[in-house]
Amino acid sequence: MAFEVDNDSFPGAIEGLKALKMRGTGVSMPNKQLACEYVDELTPAAKLVGAINTIVNDDGYLRGYNTDGTGHIRAIKESGFDIKGKTMVLLGAGGASTAIGAQGAIEGLKEIKLFNRRDEFFDKALAFAQRVNENTDCVVTDTDLADQQAFAEALASADILTNGTKVGMKPLENESLVNDISLLHPGLLVTECVYNPHMTKLLQQAQQAGCKTIDGYGMLLWQGAEQFTLWTGKDFPLEYVKQVMGFGA
């Protein structure tokens, strides 16, 4: 069931969850950051991000998780790519992007080069980078996307390029943050958070450049799988859900 809950109503919603002995809930905007204040425990990744999208209720003890990051990193791993010791160029500094960065840092990325526009997220991105640098072995830098020379240099030495922004999603389906396809090299893994459209302009560019790609369905699938297991304690019906989603089609 879905409930529309604003910030003012959120504390009451949490009390209702406990009173009804609900096993848990998903959390969407605008409550992802606020929700951190109403759980008893946060995962290491959720602490780094400062936002959660999943709450699990164990007899009134609430744990907060962020499955966006685990979902995306799981999609990368399922493709056969080992992220340990690798460098990721990460586009954007919103919720999805920072969740991916946090989980990647925890699971062994050597370096994350954040690129985002100097907008309302920029200062938050700097703070996020500082938290990751202080709490993991991963080195995170944050650079204005307007610095195209720095962007080009980062891509030249990167192993992974991940788009954590809405660029590529309808109505921006004809746009990409990569202005020059020559910046993409065959050794680069290019991954998306956007799943509508299935094949974004960035993924089209990447395939033309000979890169391996992972579309946004991977993150959608695996973050949902993580939530399912957290709430039920059971294995996710992977093949059935893949069929329903048209995954891999």
UniProtKB/Swiss-Prot annotation:
EC category name: oxidoreductase
Pathway named in the protein's UniProt entry: Metabolic intermediate biosynthesis; chorismate biosynthesis; chorismate from D-erythrose 4-phosphate and phosphoenolpyruvate: step 4/7
GO biological process, one term: chorismate biosynthetic process
Transmembrane segments: none
Chain sites annotated for binding substrate: K32, D68
Gene Ontology MF term list: quinate 3-dehydrogenase (NAD+) activity; quinate 3-dehydrogenase (NADP+) activity; shikimate 3-dehydrogenase (NAD+) activity; shikimate 3-dehydrogenase (NADP+) activity
Binding positions for NAD(+) per the UniProt entry: A93, G94, G95, A96, N116, R117, R118, D119, K166, C193, V194, Y195, N196, G216
Family matches, as CDD domains: NAD_bind_Shikimate_DH
Highest taxon listed in the record's lineage: Bacteria
Keyword Transcription appears in the UniProt entry: no
Record's catalysed reaction(s): L-quinate + NAD(+) = 3-dehydroquinate + NADH + H(+); L-quinate + NADP(+) = 3-dehydroquinate + NADPH + H(+); shikimate + NADP(+) = 3-dehydroshikimate + NADPH + H(+); shikimate + NAD(+) = 3-dehydroshikimate + NADH + H(+)
Name this protein carries in UniProt: Quinate/shikimate dehydrogenase
Originating organism: Shigella flexneri serotype 5b (strain 8401)
Gene from which this protein is expressed: ydiB
